[in-house]
């Protein structure tokens, strides 16, 4: 069960204000995430990432392919959990861009070479796979599963196809990234099925 946490962490609450635009909310949430991570020692960060792992592994039963991600900057790492998935026989795949203008694909290989955006990805010789479960990095998420990403649209394009294939989409982040307010949505947004943090796993109900 998720322990409720303030939208931007206990140390840096947002003041009362008019609802922010999506871009302003993105900047505020990203700044808050960076500020939160700066308060953590390496040991504290590692403990929180280990605390996240069982909430993710609880979703692995019957999953043949897990779509993971390489954490960038202040993103929380799912790697302790994906290593457990590999240990029990699941394939762990990572996003790979061959053309920045097209949706990325998941390749069943370790992310060992830099992609076009500086994010490590598998070599293109590895096979393309279809994940059953996708772990999705984010800047923020609300109670409807609306995800706030970096604003480039890469995950939006990829998630649309993955959702149609029946993949389960789970956002992954620090507890303070779960916002109490509603994130402004766009027609192309693909809602997440849940959100996992060190505090727990929340599965979103569809109305």
Residue ranges and their predicted role:
Residues 2-25, 31-38, 125, 129-134, ...:
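Surface-exposed, charge/polar-rich loops and edge strands
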Residues 2-129:
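N-terminal active-site beta-alpha-beta segment that forms phosphate/nucleotide-binding
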Residues 72-74, 139-143:
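Short glycine-rich anion-binding loops that position phosphate/pyrophosphate groups of nucleotides
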Residues 83, 150-156:
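Charged helix-capping and loop-helix junction motifs
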Residues 101, 134-138, 151:
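A short beta-strand-loop-alpha-helix capping motif that often carries His-Thr
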């Amino acid at each position: 069960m998720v322990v409720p946490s303030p939208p931007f962490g206990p140390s840096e609450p947002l003041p009362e204000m008019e609802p922010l635009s999506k871009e302003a909310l993105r900047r505020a949430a990203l700044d808050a995430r960076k500020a939160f991570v700066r308060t953590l020692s390496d040991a504290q960060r590692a403990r929180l990432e280990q605390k996240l792992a069982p909430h993710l592994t609880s979703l692995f039963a019957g999953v043949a392919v897990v779509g993971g991600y390489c954490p960038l900057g202040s993103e929380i790492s799912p790697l302790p959990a994906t290593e457990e998935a590999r240990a029990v026989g699941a394939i762990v795949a990572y996003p790979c861009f061959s053309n920045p203008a097209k949706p990325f694909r998941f390749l069943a290989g370790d992310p060992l070479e830099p992609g076009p955006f500086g994010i490590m990805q598998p070599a293109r010789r590895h096979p393309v796979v279809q994940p059953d479960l996708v772990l999705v990095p984010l800047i923020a998420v609300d109670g409807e599963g609306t995800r706030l990403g970096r604003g480039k649209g890469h995950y939006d394009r990829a998630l649309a196809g993955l959702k149609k294939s029946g993949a389960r989409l789970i956002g992954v982040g620090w507890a303070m990234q779960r916002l109490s307010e509603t994130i402004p949505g766009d027609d192309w947004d693909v809602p997440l099925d849940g959100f996992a943090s060190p505090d727990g796993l929340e599965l979103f109900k569809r109305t």
